[in-house]
Each structure stands twice: as structure tokens, then as C-alpha cells.
């Protein structure tokens, strides 16, 4: 039986205005996997925690795999029937999103996938943002998409802070800023941009993981990646990197944001 693991993080911020805090479920790199029929076990686990929203950090599908799109679509529709869902693309989605449907049959299927999700209420953030309010707390969720050259193996260019600003603008001054950025390779740039909370995946915990935070090699063949897996912080800023769906595992994140008082 395929298994998944739920990891809990509690993060404190003075931007959280309610004593009860805010709770999100975070999923990355599901790649069309199923945990129980129609992902029933995964859905039941999330329902148990009653999050205020679900944040998707990319790669819910496998590129050029119709079945993975069907499975991801079904799950996300079930999520959106109960919770606000915010979805930023990973490299698998982005490749199809940028492809010509006349040249790639899966690109056309992907367009239908996005259309179906939007109709179901899923907010797909193409270098865009969405504002929400939970109690008295204002939150802005940003979805960052970077060109595929930044996923190149083994060498990819540096991503500069000004490039992130060109893609998604400046962080909001009056809300908690959550950045969905699939690749954790550019964590320092995301911190410099000004995110309060960064949510990434992509690395699957590293090809070989040394400990909670350290991996020997990233999927991009980068040795000892700085932000491989787990939780990182810089002052009051935080970054969570999901290990995602590996060999018969899926790591979900339940992230509780508490006030700083």
C-alpha cells in the first residue's frame, strides 16, 4: 500500500492577527499518484485538520501522462469543493503550459486540465497573486513561474531578485506574503524578494538525503543543495521545502501560522 507522511510546522509572525492562527495544507510533487481510490485517504487526512486553504507548490502531474492529469484534476476538484485552493505550476506543468497544442498533444490536454480546474474554483497563479482574509489576517499568495532554463541540468543560471520582481511585482506591504515557488534552488533570492513564507518542492528530498535538511545531490545534479528538504529561516522569514512524492511516499505539509505575541 502506498503511504504518505504528514509533517506539521508552526510558524510565528506578527502579521498574524488572530490568536487561533491560520492553517494551510501544502502539497507538492504528487505527480498523479493516488493514495486509496481517488485519493480518498489523502483527502480524509486533510479533512481531519480542517485547513483554511490548500496551497499547491507544483508538479501535481507528470508531463506527457494523461492519466496523471486525470488523477490530479479529480483530487483538486474535490479539494476545491471544500477549501480555497491556490496552485502554482512546477516544471512538469510549465513545460506543457508553454507548449504549442498543435505540436504536442499533451499540451492541449493540459489546457483542458487548467480550464476544468478554474471552473471548479481552483486559483491557478501564473506569475500572479491572490488576496484572502482569514479572520483579521490579510494574506497574499503569490505563484512564481520561472523559465525552464532555470531547471536545466547540471548548470542553470542564477535567478536575480529583480527578475522575480519583474515576474510578480513587489510583496504586499499590508499582508502576510506567501510565495509558492516550485524550485527551492533559488531560496536566497526568494528571501531577498521579501516573502514571509516560501513553499517549494521539486527536489524530492534529494537523490540521496543525508539528514533532515541536507541532500547529497539534487535532481538537477547540484551537489549538496542548500535548500533540500525541511524548514529554513532568515530572521522572521521562513521557507518550507516538501520532499514530495518519492518511492511510494507522499509528503504533505500542514502549516500552522501563529501570531508573534
PLM region spans:
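Active-site-proximal beta-strand elements of phosphoester/diester hydrolases
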Residues: 21-31, 138-148, 178-181, 238-243
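Active-site neighborhood of phospho(di)ester-bond hydrolases with catalytic His/Asp-centered motifs
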Residues: 26-28, 53-59, 84-91, 125-128, ...
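Short, flexible loop segments at the rims of nucleotide/cofactor-binding pockets, characterized by
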Residues: 30-34, 62-65, 153-158, 176-177, ...
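Membrane-embedded segments
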Residues: 17-123
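N-terminal membrane-anchoring alpha-helices
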Residues: 1-19
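Solvent-exposed loop/turn segments at secondary-structure junctions
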Residues: 31-32, 60-63, 91-95, 130-132, ...
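Binuclear metal-dependent hydrolase catalytic cores centered on His/Asp/Glu-rich metal-binding motifs
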Residues: 97-122, 129, 134-177, 187, ...
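Conserved beta-sheet core of the metallophosphoesterase superfamily
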Residues: 178, 183-260
Amino acid at each position: 500500500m502506498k503511504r504518505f507522511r504528514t509533517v506539521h510546522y508552526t510558524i510565528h509572525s506578527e502579521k498574524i492577527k488572530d490568536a487561533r492562527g491560520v492553517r494551510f495544507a501544502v502539497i507538492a510533487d504528487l505527480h498523479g499518484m493516488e493514495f486509496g481510490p481517488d485519493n480518498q485517504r489523502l483527502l480524509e487526512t486533510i479533512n481531519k485538520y480542517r485547513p483554511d486553504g490548500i496551497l499547491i507548490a507544483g508538479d501535481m502531474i507528470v508531463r506527457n501522462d494523461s492519466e496523471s492529469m486525470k488523477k490530479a484534476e479529480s483530487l483538486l476538484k474535490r479539494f476545491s469543493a471544500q477549501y480555497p485552493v491556490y496552485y502554482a505550476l512546477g516544471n512538469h506543468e510549465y513545460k506543457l503550459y508553454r507548449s504549442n497544442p498543435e505540436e504536442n498533444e499533451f499540451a492541449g490536454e493540459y489546457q483542458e486540465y487548467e480550464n476544468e480546474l478554474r471552473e471548479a474554483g481552483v486559483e491557478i497563479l501564473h506569475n500572479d497573486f491572490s488576496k484572502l482574509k482569514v479572520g483579521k489576517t490579510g494574506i497574499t499568495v503569490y505563484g512564481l513561474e520561472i523559465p525552464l532554463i532555470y531547471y536545466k541540468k547540471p548548470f542553470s543560471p542564477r535567478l536575480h531578485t529583480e527578475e522575480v520582481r519583474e515576474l510578480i511585482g513587489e510583496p504586499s506591504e499590508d499582508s502576510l506574503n506567501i510565495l509558492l515557488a516550485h524550485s527551492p534552488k533559488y531560496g536566497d533570492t526568494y528571501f531577498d524578494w521579501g516573502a514571509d513564507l516560501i513553499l517549494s518542492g521539486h527536489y524530492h528530498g534529494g537523490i540521496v538525503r543525508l539528514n533532515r535538511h541536507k541532500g547529497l545531490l539534487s535532481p538537477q545534479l547540484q551537489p549538496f543543495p542548500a535548500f533540500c528538504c525541511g524548514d529554513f529561516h532568515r530572521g522572521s522569514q521562513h521557507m518550507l521545502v516538501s520532499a514530495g512524492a518519492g518511492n511510494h511516499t507522499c509528503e504533505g505539509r500542514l502549516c500552522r501560522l501563529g501570531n508573534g505575541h
